Amino acid sequence: MIDDTLLEAEEKMEKATNVARENFAAIRTGRANPALFSKITVEYYGTPTPLNQLASFTVADARLIVIHPYDKGSLRAIEKAIRDSDLGVNPTDDGSVIRVAIPPLTEERRRDYIKMARHEAEEARVAIRNIRRHAKDALDKLQKDGEVGEDDVRRAEKELDELTHKYVAHIDEMLKHKEAELLEV
């Protein structure tokens, strides 16, 4: 029972870390990265559809992404969705592909993105701590119900604290890399 609680907590912490990783990837750094488009949805025949289901992406160079729509009829809708997004890029199409030049970031924009990254990291840390709290409550309930002894619960809580520290440190490391990437000119 204790092992199940710890395993469930670790799985949830891993998921929270993965969500943070995806959110960090979606923050623009001034370099061409297809993950920038992961949160964009396109009105495709009246249905909001994720862009990555409508096209493939090629990174032509450090500041250029070429988008190849699977259906040429979706070209205008994809271009409009990118233009309307908050990425601050200007897509151009040549009738068969869309080219997106990634402009260099201004110092002010870099600071905004760093704030955004720190906010994402804090949300992930809070999620991990909440998972820890729920797992600790479950362990306390097991002890209260008399299913496990106090020593076992203390050992499990120590393990839970180590897990929490490990995942929070991982989030901090990802944030450090993202900040370095954003500050790189």
UniProtKB/Swiss-Prot annotation:
<dbReference type="Pfam" id="PF01765">
    <property type="entry name" value="RRF"/>
</dbReference>
<keyword id="KW-0963">Cytoplasm</keyword>
<dbReference type="InterPro" id="IPR002661">
    <property type="entry name" value="Ribosome_recyc_fac"/>
</dbReference>
<dbReference type="GO" id="GO:0006415">
    <property type="term" value="P:translational termination"/>
</dbReference>
<protein>
    <recommendedName>
        <fullName>Ribosome-recycling factor</fullName>
    </recommendedName>
</protein>
<dbReference type="GO" id="GO:0043023">
    <property type="term" value="F:ribosomal large subunit binding"/>
</dbReference>
<dbReference type="InterPro" id="IPR023584">
    <property type="entry name" value="Ribosome_recyc_fac_dom"/>
</dbReference>
<comment type="similarity">
    <text>Belongs to the RRF family.</text>
</comment>
<comment type="function">
    <text>Responsible for the release of ribosomes from messenger RNA at the termination of protein biosynthesis. May increase the efficiency of translation by recycling ribosomes from one round of translation to another.</text>
</comment>
<dbReference type="GO" id="GO:0005737">
    <property type="term" value="C:cytoplasm"/>
</dbReference>
<dbReference type="InterPro" id="IPR036191">
    <property type="entry name" value="RRF_sf"/>
</dbReference>
<keyword id="KW-0648">Protein biosynthesis</keyword>
